[in-house]
C-alpha cells in the first residue's frame, strides 16, 4: 500500500484519451495551470513528449513532490499510456500514481459543478 501524499505538493495531471490525439492538462491543488490543453499523438512517439512535459514541470517547480495522473478508461486507447507513465523512470522520484477513470463517472461528476 502506498503512503498518503500531501496534496499541496502534488501535481495533478488529467489526460483526455482519444483514438488519435490525447489532450493533457496539469495543475496544482489551487487550480493553477502548468500545462493547459496540450494535444499529443496517441502513439509511442507521442507518449515520450507527454512524459517530458510532465517531467519539465516537476523539474521547474520544486514544490512538487508527487504526481497524480488521471485518465479516462476508454478501452485500449489509454492502456499503453497508463502503463508507460506508471513505469516512467523520469516520474518515479515523484511517487507517480496513475488512475484510469470510468468516463461516465467523470461526466456525472462534472455535472455536479455549475462552472465547469
Regions found by a protein language model. Give the residues of each.
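Phosphate- and other anionic-substrate recognition elements at nucleic-acid/protein interfaces
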Residues: 1-116
Amino acid at each position: 500500500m502506498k503512503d498518503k501524499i500531501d496534496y499541496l505538493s502534488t501535481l495533478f495531471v488529467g489526460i483526455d484519451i482519444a483514438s488519435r490525439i490525447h489532450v493533457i492538462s496539469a495543475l496544482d491543488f489551487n487550480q493553477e495551470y502548468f500545462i493547459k490543453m496540450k494535444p499529443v499523438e496517441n502513439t509511442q512517439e507521442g507518449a515520450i513528449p507527454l512524459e517530458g512535459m510532465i517531467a519539465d514541470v516537476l523539474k521547474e517547480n520544486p514544490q512538487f513532490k508527487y504526481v497524480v495522473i488521471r485518465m479516462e478508461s476508454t478501452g485500449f486507447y489509454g492502456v499503453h499510456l497508463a502503463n508507460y507513465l506508471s513505469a516512467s523512470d523520469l516520474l518515479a522520484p515523484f511517487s507517480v500514481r496513475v488512475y484510469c477513470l470510468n468516463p461516465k463517472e467523470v461526466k456525472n461528476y462534472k455535472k455536479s459543478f455549475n462552472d465547469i
